Amino acid sequence: MHALHSNPTMPALLDVAVAADIQVSVVYYKYRTSPFYIHSICLITGVKLCNSTPLLYTIIYIASLKMNYNGAEGLEFGGGNTKVDPSVLSELPKGCRVVATESHGVSFWANTGRIDVELLDGTLQKFFIKVISEEQGKYMMHGEFESMKTIHTLMPDFAPRPIAWGTYKSIPNTHFFLCDYRDMIDEMPDPHKFASRLAALHQNSKSPNGKFGFHLTTYSGNLPQMNEWEDSWEVYFAKCLRNALDLELEAKGDDPEFHVLVPIIFEKVIPRLLRPLETEGRSVKPSLVHGDLWYANSGIDVDSDESLIFDACCFYAHNEYEFGQWRPVCNKFGAEYLATYHSYAQISAPVEDYDGRLDLYKLRFNTHVSALFIESETLREQMLGDMRDLVKRYG
């Protein structure tokens, strides 16, 4: 998830009330930066929301949500610290001097910061860094680096330049992702600028072997996606959805409706909506997708006024898959963005199945997010509602 701008000095005392039997993590956001993002998180997680210091801070309580970060003593960002791990320093410009580090942004899964350096010629340069712990964190950082590298190589003006990923030398089992720092404003991008770039990403990308998938596992949040190569989009998507359902079941346990709905989804709904894309002379081009392109994973560059995307978990997919993430209630990429996108890239045939396909793709996203937020029954009910609707229409 996107690491939003945050104020490094948080209120020491906050007037909040929390049920005593709920284990919580407290995440602070500067309210005026992105009120929509705050409320989006509340909608998708079912968390409690309250305001402290009107129009300045919002506190989100996320039940039992564990960050994948165990701390990095002596190397935390901010507080006057200018020390960075040798592995990170080796990836910064040769001969530079670190003049400041700051905690920058908020992430559910990682620690995020900004590193300011002075180059040999006296100019200043800034970098964004994300740090995460444990073996799983290594795979998460590798997947994000490869995703952002693939996007940046294809469209360098559409994503911050990824520089490196690696493992700290001074702290065991601590991993990082490093990229150029881009100062961004948290506003919706111009539909035409954004849609034209996204369409170009989809249209100009080329799967290295002509198949659907990716060359390594990528992570949406802190959970893996199924990226093994497949010739058929229908087969690939079914495996992706099955993986997400397995993760959701592991997180929240069984539900009687699963035994009724899931077989129909796989035996009837998926073939009904996806098989026509690859029959009667039709085919699906494997396009590079961001993989988690909701509003909070985009921004507008302060200097260029151009739209940017980040926090990618890429793979090669049907381009319309991207818009499954634009269907849930937390979405802010509305009909105008879809219509503008399709002025650059036409809807796949059969056109009459378009809405159904997007709702099927939405199920994949909603299943994954339900697996991420274990305590949220709202998200499971949302997922089951998606299944009921699809079964009623296409089962």
What are the language-model segments listed below?
Residues 229-242, 246-247, 283-288, 295-355, ...:
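Active-site Asp-x-Gly
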Residues 96-101:
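Conserved N-terminal boundary motif of the eukaryotic protein kinase catalytic domain
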Residues 104-231:
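ATP-binding pocket architecture of kinase catalytic cores
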Residues 80-92, 167-170, 206-290, 301-304:
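An alpha-helical support segment within catalytic cores of ATP-dependent transferases
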